[in-house]
């Protein structure tokens, strides 16, 4: 059983997918993390972010592992834990640029599809339901206004003791949205058969409840109660 959750950055996909994976006892694929790891490797090796051929070659030889630890998933690159490094704004922006290239996406496609070998999978990304797993049994598309997503990001930074600039955060989100929605290869859009969820005015618990209700209607049973984490 495969459940895909697509949507823009900051809509709450990470929190929703983590909750669903725990509730159902499914494996979790964070495709955004794969692109972030690719971007991090490119930055570390000073690979030109406009050179599609070099980036694709880099992507083909990445050693990426997802290791469940203490209720979270640690992400390893060549054996090194890069879970925190890939969450910086620099890496996020680089990942959005790297993801526009067809050769890079092709290089990473098989890596993502290999996760389907699990008995159950929650796939978090931007093209999970349209490209990577077009035959998934359940598809969700989670969205929120750019302003609301910027507020969430600003609050996250404040909670970490970081003084963010709201106007800059909003501008960066809008720029990334434009790139993601208008790229020629696998643009961000809901699958025709996806349930659309707008989290702009909803709490995370309300989003999870709506998603679970839809999943239940598809005949999927829950294994145990989930624990929620902040995205």
From Swiss-Prot:
E.C. number(s) listed in UniProt: 2.7.4.25
List of residues binding ATP: 7-15
Molecular function terms from GO: (d)CMP kinase activity; ATP binding; CMP kinase activity; dCMP kinase activity
SUPFAM superfamilies xrefs: P-loop containing nucleoside triphosphate hydrolases
Coiled-coil parts of chain: none
Cellular component, GO, one term: cytosol
Alphabetical UniProt keywords: ATP-binding, Cytoplasm, Kinase, Nucleotide-binding, Transferase
InterPro entries referenced in this protein's UniProt entry, alphabetically: Cytidylate_kin, Cytidylate_kinase_dom, P-loop_NTPase
Transmembrane segments: none
Catalysed reaction, written as an equation: CMP + ATP = CDP + ADP; dCMP + ATP = dCDP + ADP
Pfam families: Cytidylate_kin (PF02224)
GO-annotated biological processes: nucleobase-containing small molecule interconversion; pyrimidine nucleotide metabolic process
Subcellular location: Cytoplasm
Enzyme class: transferase
Family: Belongs to the cytidylate kinase family. Type 1 subfamily.
PANTHER family with a match to the protein in the record: CYTIDYLATE KINASE (PTHR21299:SF2), CYTIDYLATE KINASE/PANTOATE-BETA-ALANINE LIGASE (PTHR21299)
The name this protein goes by in its record: Cytidylate kinase 1
Gene: cmk1
């Amino acid at each position: 059983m495969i459940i895909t959750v697509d949507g823009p950055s900051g809509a709450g996909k990470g929190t929703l997918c983590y909750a669903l994976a725990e509730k159902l006892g499914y494996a979790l694929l964070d495709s955004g993390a794969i692109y972030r790891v690719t971007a991090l490797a490119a930055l570390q090796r000073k690979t030109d972010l406009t050179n599609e051929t070099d980036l694709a070659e880099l992507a083909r030889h990445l050693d990426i592992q997802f290791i469940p630890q203490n209720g979270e998933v640690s992400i390893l690159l060549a054996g090194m834990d890069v879970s925190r490094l890939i969450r910086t704004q620099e890496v996020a922006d680089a990942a959005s640029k790297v993801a526009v290239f067809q050769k890079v996406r092709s290089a990473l496609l098989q890596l993502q599809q290999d996760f389907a070998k699990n008995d159950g999978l929650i796939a978090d990304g931007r093209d999970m339901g349209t490209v990577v797993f077009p035959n998934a049994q359940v598809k969700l598309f989670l969205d929120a206004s750019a302003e609301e997503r910027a507020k969430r990001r600003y609050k996250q930074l404040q909670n970490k003791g970081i003084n963010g600039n709201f106007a800059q955060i909003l501008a960066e989100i809008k720029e990334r949205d434009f790139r993601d929605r208008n790229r020629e290869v696998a643009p961000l859009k809901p699958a025709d058969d996806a349930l659309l969820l707008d989290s702009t005015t909803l709490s995370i618990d309300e989003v999870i409840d709506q998603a679970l209700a839809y999943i239940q209607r598809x005949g999927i049973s829950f294994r145990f109660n989930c624990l929620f984490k902040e995205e």
